[in-house]
Amino acid sequence: MRFIRRNRGFTLIELLIVIIIIGILAAIAIPMFLNQRDKAKNATVKGGVHNVELGIASYAIDHSDTYPGTGTVSKATMVDGIGTPYVDDWPQNPYAGGDMVEGAGAGNYTYTLTSTNFTLVGHGRGGANIITAP
């Protein structure tokens, strides 16, 4: 009696092709995933800048339409200062952790006062400007 032997399985070429396809899919998916993380961090910075902007507007209402001076917008003056806090919960820096501070680094803001108005700029990765208020 003869036994018929059937080899079932994948060849080396087939396995290599599958590995190459998985590598190509990973090369496409990983940068897209990292880009989504940056978008989420930028959205956090935008929300934080908006909260600080509202705090500055509240400060101006309480001080005869006078905005705080350049370099004076911080957690110490807008939240922890004497009297009513102008920002209930100071925004966090999504890039470095901790509180958002004035400066050009990622996740921070820059506040500039002109004679009639102010400019508040939020910074993303590498210090790039991602939002300007108002």
PLM-predicted stretches and their roles:
Residues L16-M32:
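Alpha-helical hydrophobic helix detector
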Residues H123-P134:
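Low-complexity, S/T/G/P-rich flexible repeat/linker segments used as non-globular hinges
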Residues A40-D65:
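Membrane-proximal N-terminal amphipathic helix
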Residues M1-F10:
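N-terminal leader/signal peptides at the extreme start of proteins
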Residues A57, I61-T119:
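Extracellular/periplasmic head regions of type IV pilus-like filament subunits
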